[in-house]
């Protein structure tokens, strides 16, 4: 394992994720934001966390949470611990396998996706509001949050909800130069040989 490669990934990702999370919090807390209308309880949770701990602390912990989740999911994908890859594309593809399957109407039963999640993902992919890229990002976000919720049952320390983290999930995860793309590239099969890559 190349510890310098992983260390560089962690330092670069931390700054990028902090900026992304801070921007998402600002957008979510705007008066009349879609999140305020659709998820008022989580929005209030987020506001309470900021009031209790301060904005910097919430940004830092949320960025840290998402970095750890994405790295853990990459490790689990490489090691075959997920029924289908959650953050990793299949060979020759560009989208994570879970999203490619969902676009075909296939939802692995091992993830236990609720009817509501499946319907929302299919509705968004079939032509909900926004551009094609935005719809794809929104559908992937739904899947990613549902997977984290599922794994939270067994690993709450890693995938449990913290300060409404699902509400401020980093955007642009499917972009070529995204933090997720860097994680997938830098945490290759060789790097994932040992669980130390997560430490």
Predicted region positions:
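Preference for the N-terminal adenyl/adenosyl cofactor-binding alpha/beta module
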Residues: 1-199
């Amino acid at each position: 394992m190349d510890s310098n490669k992983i260390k560089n990934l962690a330092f670069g990702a931390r700054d990028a994720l902090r900026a992304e999370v801070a921007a998402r919090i600002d957008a979510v807390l705007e008066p009349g934001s879609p999140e305020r209308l659709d998820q008022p309880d989580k929005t209030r949770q987020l506001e309470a966390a900021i009031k209790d701990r301060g904005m910097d602390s919430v940004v830092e912990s949320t960025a840290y949470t998402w970095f750890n989740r994405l790295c853990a999911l990459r490790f689990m994908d490489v090691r075959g611990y997920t029924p289908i890859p959650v953050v990793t594309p299949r060979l020759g593809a560009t989208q994570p396998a879970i999203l490619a399957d969902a676009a075909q109407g296939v939802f692995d039963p091992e993830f236990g996706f609720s009817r509501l999640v499946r319907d929302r993902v299919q509705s968004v992919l079939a032509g909900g509001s926004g551009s094609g890229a935005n719809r794809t990002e929104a559908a992937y976000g739904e899947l990613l949050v549902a997977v984290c919720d599922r794994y939270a049952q067994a690993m709450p320390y890693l995938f449990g909800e913290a300060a409404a983290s699902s509400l401020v999930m980093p955007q642009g995860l499917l972009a070529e130069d995204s933090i997720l793309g860097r994680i997938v590239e830098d945490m290759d099969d060789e790097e994932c040989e040992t669980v130390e890559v997560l430490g």
